[in-house]
C-alpha cells in the first residue's frame, strides 16, 4: 500500500492524542535492463583512380635568339614624325630611334645592349628645318584704379505691432444632474 499516509484521528479526541507517523521511504529498485546489442554497417570501400600528373608542354628554348623590326611614321596632318629599328643577335641588341621635336629639330638615339657592357645610348640632335618661333612680346599689365565702396548702413526697424484680442468668455451652466437609464432592481 501507500506508505507515509497521515494518521487518521477520531474526531473529538484530545489534541495530545493526535500524532503523525514518521516518514517512510520505499526501497530503491535494483533492476537494470540488459544492454541492447547494436549493429553497425561496415564502411563502404571506395576506389579512386590515381591522380594523373599533368606534364608541362615542352617550352622551346632558343640558345641563340634573333629578331629584327622597324617602323616609320610620317603624319603631315598632326606633324608626328618618328622612326625606329632594332635587331638582336644572341645576347646583343642594337637599335636606333628618332623623332621630331616641337622646335623642328630631330633627336636620334642610337643604343646597344649586351651582357658585358649593359645598355648604352648615344643621343644626337640635328637643327630643325624651321627656326624656333621668336617669343611674343607681352603687353604690360594695366593698373586699375581702386574703387571706393561705401560701408553698409545698419538699420533696424521697430517690431510690427500686433492686434491684441481678448480671450473668449466661458459661460458655465448650472442645472440638475442628468440621469442615465433606469434603476436596477
From Swiss-Prot:
Q: Which UniProt keywords apply?
A: Cuticle, Repeat
| Organism superkingdom | Eukaryota
Cystines in this chain:
none
InterPro entries according to UniProt: CHIT_BIND_RR_consensus, Insect_cuticle, Insect_Cuticle_Struc_Prot
Please list the residue ranges annotated as the Chitin-binding type R&R domain.
Answer: 64-134
Q: So where does this one cross the membrane?
A: none
State the sequence repeat positions: 21-24, 33-36, 41-44, 133-136, 139-142, 150-153
Q: Name one Pfam family in it.
A: Chitin_bind_4
GO cellular component terms?
extracellular matrix; extracellular space
Record GO terms (molecular function):
structural constituent of cuticle
UniProt xrefs under PANTHER family: CCP84AA-RELATED (PTHR12236:SF94), STRUCTURAL CONTITUENT OF CUTICLE (PTHR12236)
The function of this protein is:
Component of the cuticle of migratory locust which contains more than 100 different structural proteins.
Q: What does the entry's domain section say?
A: The tetrapeptide (A-A-P-[AV]) repeats found throughout the protein are also present in many proteins constituting the protective envelope of other species.
Protein name, please?
Cuticle protein 18.6, isoform B
